[in-house]
Amino acid sequence: MATPVDTEYYDLLGISTDATAVDIKKAYRKLAVKYHPDKNPDDPQGASEKFQKISEAYQVLGDEKLRSQYDQFGKEKAVPEQGFTDAYDFFTNLFGGAPFREWVGELSFVKEMFREEDSAVEQGQMNDKQQLLLESSEPTPTIKQQFNDRKKNAQIREREALAKREQEMIEDRRQRIKEVTENLEKRLDDWIAKATTEEGLNALREKYTQEANTLRIESFGVEILHAIGEVYTQKGRTVLKSSKFGIGGFWSRMKEKGKIARATWDTVSAAMDAKLSIDQMQKLEDKGEDQASAEERAKLELDITGKILRASWCGARYDIQGVLREACSNLLKKRVPTELRLKRAHALLEIGTIFSNVEADPDDPNRIFENLILENKKKRKKGSEAKPPKAT
């Protein structure tokens, strides 16, 4: 293999020039999480620039044709036909991406993540201007007054921007629930219309099994299918038990509330765990001491990546299931005719069961992020089991 004329992209991803496609993807995904601006609040602009360079490197090296062009002629001759995609696309596609859009809509936490990034950069620029005003000359009473006025106006604008973002979030969620509800209604209506015979029912089961097998190969595909399946089966069983036993529906609703509470706790604790590890790593770097070997530091970085991913996935799952519960509830309201409501519940239970039974391929080399989370869970479980009991 000839030596590439330019190695900048390889250096950015920290890989050798003979790295395999899997090695390239692993390196990119690890760095994309590490340098995402949302995970670097102290320097969102610098992290954003680094993130974009990493993304650009992956888009070239991850494409066999572009990589060949890059190796032979350099990066000027290795540009995608449609241009480079931005960093937003990475996190949009991290949890399912376009193939799942019809099922769960666009994840709100991704949109909010980038809204906050833009706000942080804008606020940082405003603070720099205010600081320049103070440092430009002797801070006379007039300059101090100008500084205080600007600071006050900036705070007002910040509150207004926050209120605007919150309103946008509410409207985005309302629209997303509406679209997911409409898509689900079409699917349930189709199921009800075709499931009138044993042959039709078997054909539907085969159709959704094939669709699930297609979706499972997407990033976090199996996990998202399980999240969808859990909500569908829970909602379907609640309606069917309420119709048959009455009290059974009550216990199903209580069980659902318990799962929501657990999911909330998982999301919060995962975020706290990730932040603690990031803070520990930052303290180590701030000291500037070689307290850990390269191997130990690499393990720590990998552990942090796993924790960040776990926190991100917990947030994504919470987001997905919250929207799906609303969509299912819209289609199972008591004002819906009883017969139709029961048929929809049966259809939800069928589809949910198919999705819940999907299994991951343990040898799939593309399940890099998912396996990192799995390893992180194993470490947490092992750590909790290793803790000695408290003295009484």
From Swiss-Prot:
Give the SUPFAM superfamilies listed for this entry.
Chaperone J-domain
**InterPro entries linked:** DnaJ_domain, DnaJ_domain_CS, DnaJ_X, J_dom_sf, Peroxisomal_DnaJ
CDD domains noted in UniProt? DnaJ
At what positions is Phosphoserine found? S108
Offer an example of a GO molecular function term for this protein.
Hsp70 protein binding
One Pfam family name is DnaJ
A cellular component term from Gene Ontology for this protein is: mitochondrion
Q: What is this protein called?
A: Uncharacterized J domain-containing protein C4H3.01
Per UniProt, the keywords (alphabetical) are:
Chaperone, Phosphoprotein
What Gene3D superfamilies does this protein map onto? DnaJ domain (1.10.287.110)
A single Gene Ontology biological process assigned to it is: protein insertion into mitochondrial outer membrane
Which intervals hold domain J?
7-76
